[in-house]
Curated annotation (Swiss-Prot):
GO terms for biological process: translation. Belongs to the universal ribosomal protein uS2 family. The gene is rpsB. GO terms for molecular function: structural constituent of ribosome. SUPFAM superfamilies: Ribosomal protein S2. GO terms for cellular component: cytosolic small ribosomal subunit. Keywords: Ribonucleoprotein, Ribosomal protein. This is Small ribosomal subunit protein uS2.
Length: 262
């Protein structure tokens, strides 16, 4: 059973939003306070978002469908691939190609081309063609693999998508909404939560925060067949929470980790 504590969220810098001037007004309901011109997110609502997302993911997996992990920004890319691979799920971590969902059949043709080239490389076909042809085919393979390797085994549309940074992945969100595919996403204070089915209020820039959220989704997938849920431990009262926020109010840790949360 996954155990999530409010203190673990604080330690990952989950509560840090952007500068107050960058607030999307639709995020106001998720704001706890303001410190040094930085919005502080309400971790009670973050915990609820985690719980709702965990349960949705487990329902999707039990229905025999997959969750597509999406995160192409620098500080999310490696984490997205790592956690998607750990839970044997498809992922997009380099660039979202328009139509990956809405024009899925065409994208599948490109995936089949990639698989064919990979097969040619190992079945001896390359031994029977010229070096020039091999070079051309390798360039084509690398180009396809760069954007499609994470979805090679996604034979059908996913049952849900998990997204880091919905502002950056707006095209993916539009396609998922068009196809009525449930969207789970970490939403920072500059995001629009109203287009997300399961919004998780949180810092989508700091590496530790991104890693924590992505691991939680991966854990939900891996534990879906064990009939176990998630345990939320709210181990800080409001007074303690304010003290912790004051202690951790220096945003330098988040920035040093690859965040650009200002």
């Amino acid at each position: 059973m996954a155990i999530i504590t409010m203190k673990s969220l604080l330690e990952a810098g989950v509560h840090f939003g952007h500068q107050v001037k960058r607030l999307d007004p639709r995020m106001k309901r998720f704001i706890f306070s303001e410190r040094n011109e930085i919005h502080i997110l309400d971790l009670q609502k973050t915990l609820q978002g985690i719980k709702d997302s965990y349960e949705l993911v487990q329902r999707v997996i039990k229905d025999g469908k997959k969750v597509l992990f999406i995160g192409t920004k620098k500080q999310a890319s490696e984490i997205i691939e790592q956690e998607a691979r750990r839970s044997d799920m498809p992922y997009v971590n380099n660039r979202w190609l328009g139509g990956m969902l809405s024009n899925f059949n065409t994208i599948r043709k490109s995936v089949q081309k990639l698989k064919k080239l990979e097969k040619m490389e190992v079945d001896g076909t390359f031994d029977m063609i010229s070096k020039k042809e091999i070079s051309q085919l390798n360039r084509e393979k690398l180009k396809l693999a760069k954007n499609l390797s994470g979805i090679k085994d996604m034979e059908t549309l996913p049952g849900a998508v998990f997204i880091i940074d919905p502002k950056r992945e707006q095209i993916a969100i539009n396609e998922a909404r068009k196809l009525k595919i449930p969207i789970i996403s970490v939403v920072d204070t500059n995001c629009n939560p109203d287009v997300i089915d399961c919004p998780i209020p949180g810092n989508d820039d700091a590496i530790r925060s991104v890693a924590l959220f992505t691991k939680i989704i991966s854990d939900a997938i891996l534990e879906s067949d064990k009939e176990v849920g998630i345990q939320i431990i709210e181990n800080l009262n409001e007074e303690d929470l304010m003290k912790e926020i004051e202690i951790k109010n220096d945003k330098s840790d988040s920035i040093e980790e690859g965040g650009n949360n200002l």
